[in-house]
């Protein structure tokens, strides 16, 4: 897989209360990923970009919400979320550098 595709697969870490609890309890990191990305691409991207070993990947497509602004009705885009479980002894911390 090309370096360009690796960078396009992972869009951002998804930070939420549920994601934080998963990270602490089951060593699972949550990412926003490209809609067309598959589990193999997500695994390769995480392993190569962050130099950690991935145990499993679960994905879900989050449906966009319908929003109104006055009489106009629109819809937000669908997006894909990936739950990446790291192997025992592996860790990935996004908040550590921000504390300084």
Swiss-Prot record:
GO terms for cellular component: ribonucleoprotein complex; ribosome. Keywords: Ribonucleoprotein, Ribosomal protein, RNA-binding, rRNA-binding. InterPro entries: Nucleotide-bd_a/b_plait_sf (IPR012677), Ribosomal_uL23-like (IPR013025), Ribosomal_uL23/eL15/eS24_sf (IPR012678), Ribosomal_uL23_CS (IPR001014). GO terms for biological process: translation. Signal peptide: none annotated. It holds the Pfam family Ribosomal_L23. It comes from the Bacteria. GO terms for molecular function: rRNA binding; structural constituent of ribosome. One of the early assembly proteins it binds 23S rRNA. One of the proteins that surrounds the polypeptide exit tunnel on the outside of the ribosome. Forms the main docking site for trigger factor binding to the ribosome. Part of the 50S ribosomal subunit. Contacts protein L29, and trigger factor when it is bound to the ribosome. Belongs to the universal ribosomal protein uL23 family. This is Large ribosomal subunit protein uL23. It comes from Aggregatibacter actinomycetemcomitans (Actinobacillus actinomycetemcomitans).
